[in-house]
């Protein structure tokens, strides 16, 4: 079991939560990015640098993730592909994507893309709040408890 991080867009504060969690859980954590990343020394944490380009990091995460893994991403199509492979997917605001919710999120994403393409300003997400960080940590812990229960 591995935690995969779409690291180019992942907020630093979320990475810090993940570093601590990887140590505590003794779980491999792989940060995939198209640039060099500084991570704390750990036998559980590593980086995987990929070539720059559209969806290169996403495609690498999809290629390597397996059923039971966790993918941290705000990218809806990446989350959908991870779920299709049997992995769990969580965004940096603590929202866990599920097979039931991912279709709705994909539809909304496509709708917003259409609005932007037609020149309508849709704005971006609010900045990450303390509540978001707490929700992320809580959902990560919930996932970890599910993993432990499934191991028996």
UniProtKB/Swiss-Prot annotation:
Domain of life: Bacteria
One Pfam short name: DUF188
NCBIfam families xrefs: PRK00124.1
Family in the record: Belongs to the UPF0178 family.
Name of the protein this chain belongs to: UPF0178 protein YaiI
Organism: Shigella flexneri
Name of the encoding gene: yaiI
